[in-house]
Amino acid sequence: MDIRITPRKLNGAVTPPASKSMAHRAVLALALADGQGTLSNLSDSQDIQATKRCVEALKALRPDGALPFLDCGESGSTLRFLIPIALAVSGGGVFTGHGRLMERPQGPYFDIFKEKGIFYEQKDGVLTVQGTLTPGVYRLPGNVSSQFVTGLLYALPLRPGDPTVEL
């Protein structure tokens, strides 16, 4: 097979694929703003679909008072962003995932939960969290994934008081 490449000037426009990281954050920002806005050019990855499903699960009414069931697929971003958001809007959640997602470390959140008296249990591939985000200081090590910081920064303004995140 012969291929000939001829240099020439190109015209047109290219729309690069959206950043998955930014797409997660945009979906959550819109959901927390009561859906007042429009998103376009979002990544349609399985991770973004998982975030959208979890947002819908958080919005669903549960007359029995049960915690929402949040299937995060294989998305670490979805899981780490939504753990504190679920505490802020629903008093907690029951999280599950696929692949090795539920084996990923959540230690920075667990340390906060111990300090704040928030219940958590990780067993058989399911993470249950239940409690209330209260005013005060939320400390995270400076070397943790930005996913932990983002989750807290999205969740804490939804609660009364004047919380602080320290790195």
Per-range role (PLM):
Residues 1-167:
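Structural preference for solvent-exposed beta-strand-turn elements
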